[in-house]
Amino acid sequence: MEDYKSEILNKICYTALVYDRINKKLNTQLEKDEIEKMIYEIIEGTDTKKFQKTGKNIYITNNYRNVRLTINSYTNRIITADRLNKKTRK
């Protein structure tokens, strides 16, 4: 399996619109530098087994932070961040 984690951490980039999208999807009001720090920490703290490449995107699922990141595998550009649905345990 390829080492997506180190490549993404070294080359991650952002578009101007993605900051607003992340704040909206995660229901936060973070500044650009806070978002970049949060994304870096999520990627760094996620086990490589939770990196899944499907088509042109890499999905990074961090259950501890309850977040899934979507990153373009060709450009290493973050596309979005989504909250995971919490399942009710019986």
Regions found by a protein language model. Name each.
Residues 1-90:
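Ribonuclease/tRNase effector modules and their secretory precursors
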